[in-house]
């Protein structure tokens, strides 16, 4: 109970706005306030102030679950992309993030935890982008966070890079025309047709 409802050590994110029409394809504008209890670990707090940040449901097979994942796009007060880095050294500023519920695996270890382990400890071959900027990554980064939507406590999520966090992952077809990036349209689809080119 205290961990979930009286926690002072985890960052908190508050999303405010009408979610009626939100789907995995349709964004809705929301206000976003982020409260960091420790700037060294979790970056600076911020409040976008107005409801102009596009937010949509994220995922494929997870769409059926009670708790959804969300992709958030940070915007400043003028509607321009707002770049932010809550992860510190080893990451770059982004404007696209994922709030990951990890509903089936609530320890939050196998998704972000495994990705961080692979990026930091296992895979040491550098991509072209990493050769230019060592803070770019081959996997997502993230940490646990409490999420509230319109005042309702949604639970402990992971505050991750999104798969469309192009600055962090080095997706630049103009700069690297031979780059190959593929997505899988569903975790349950193992056919060749499940793969499609990103971008």
Name these PLM-found stretches.
Residues 1-199:
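Phosphate/dinucleotide-binding and metal-coordinating scaffold of catalytic cores
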């Amino acid at each position: 109970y205290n961990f979930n409802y009286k926690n002072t050590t985890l960052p908190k994110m508050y999303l405010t706005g009408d979610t009626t029409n939100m789907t995995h394809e349709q964004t809705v504008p929301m206000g976003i306030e982020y409260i960091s209890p420790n700037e060294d670990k979790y970056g600076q707090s911020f409040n976008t102030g107005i409801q102009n940040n596009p937010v949509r449901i994220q995922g494929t097979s997870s769409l059926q679950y009670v708790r959804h994942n969300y992709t958030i796009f940070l915007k400043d007060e003028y509607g321009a992309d707002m770049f932010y880095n809550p992860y510190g050294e080893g990451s770059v500023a982004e404007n696209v993030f994922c709030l990951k519920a990890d509903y089936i695996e609530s320890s939050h270890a196998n998704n972000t935890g495994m990705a961080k382990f692979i990026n930091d400890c296992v895979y040491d071959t550098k991509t072209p982008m990493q050769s230019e900027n060592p803070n770019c990554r081959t996997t997502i980064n993230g940490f646990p966070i409490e999420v509230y939507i319109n005042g309702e406590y949604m639970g402990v999520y992971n505050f991750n890079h999104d798969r469309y966090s192009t600055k962090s992952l080095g997706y630049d077809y103009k700069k690297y025309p031979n780059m190959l990036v593929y997505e899988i349209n569903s975790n349950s689809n193992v056919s060749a047709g499940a793969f499609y080119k990103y971008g």
